[in-house]
Amino acid sequence: MRTKIAMMIAMVVLVALVGGGTALAQTIGGVIQCQSFPCVATGDHQVLFERVGDGVRDRLIAQAGHDHLNARTYTNDRDVAKGSGGHDLLMVNDGDAMDGAIGGPGNDTCIVDAAIEAADTCETVVYR
């Protein structure tokens, strides 16, 4: 009987660890679909996507790590992508030229629609 109880406890712990690892990966690394304003990375190498919908302004903020901030899917809005430590990729080329890409202390690349969207803190600027 004790062996069965010990096996059940071990299975519960194993399931909790496996399931918890997936939830942890969604918040501390990998891809984040933003749901809030502002949307802030957690400090790992991450890809942040702007909130869903045209006309929805976003503020994506990188943390330490080499982050990719993607605010180029939806248009007719004023998005801001702000880099932090690390080599960040800030993409605000959504076709409306109303956005802002602000590099941080790392070596950041800003992809924009027009020169006015790129701050002088972007080490590399690409126009698309």
What are these regions (language model features)?
Residues G100-A101:
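Short Cys/His-rich zinc-binding micro-motifs
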Residues Q26-I32:
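Cleaved targeting-peptide boundary
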Residues M8-V18:
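Bacterial N-terminal signal peptides
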Residues M1-I9:
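Bacterial N-terminal signal peptides that target proteins for export
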Residues S36, G43-H45, V52-V56, A64-H66, ...:
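Extracellular, beta-strand-rich repeat scaffolds characterized by small/acidic residue-biased motifs
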Residues G21-A25:
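Sec/Tat signal peptide C-region and signal peptidase I cleavage site
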